[in-house]
Amino acid sequence: YYRDFLPDILAANRGSMDWATWRQVPILQRADLQAHGQSLNSERVPESHLPLSTGKTSGSTGRPVDLVGTRLTDAMWNAFTLRGHLWHGRDLSARLATIKIFAQPHPALLDQGLVLPTWGPATEMFSPRGDAVILSATVPVSQQWRWLKAQQPAYLLSYPSNLAALAEESLQQDVGLESLRGVISIGERLTAAQRQLCRAAWQLEIKDIYSAEEVGYIAHQSPQ
């Protein structure tokens, strides 16, 4: 991809690649990723970075983008995941519940949910380690709430809008979730009103994560 225009930029700057030259390199746009995805992939991936993995963005802001990751990008993602858990003092031996959208959901995710042996690759090296329960966010909120009551997780991860809907369900029924120790939001802009709803329902502060499939973690909410 860059071979098409970098030689011209370098020639115009007598082969110099200083900051002034870098500023002439066009900023990569989402449309560029969609139109030139294959030519943006490295042709010489180091052996130590293999195997490659593939993925796709959610398409929440437009047409999805196809992605290619490496062993190194996976390691970095897991490292930042673990750092977030440790920053917020989460008990890795407890249960984590995740409610989100799945591109190709297992039938159980639309009904009783699934139980996984660990929270994921970032924590599976620890012992004792907690399990994870997952459910599709397309399930009605009332059913999600019943499922949470049955699963009794220590931590709940979902979208801000879904967390707010669950908090409203909890307040309407005047029933809390005694096991809950932490709430984590992903995938959407978190508002002050949504924070307040969770505070009122569960006496807990939402810990927000800002990330994207294309680049991984962008920001973690400060523990302070």
Please give the residue ranges for each predicted region:
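Intrinsically disordered, low-complexity coil segments
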Residues: 11-17, 116-128
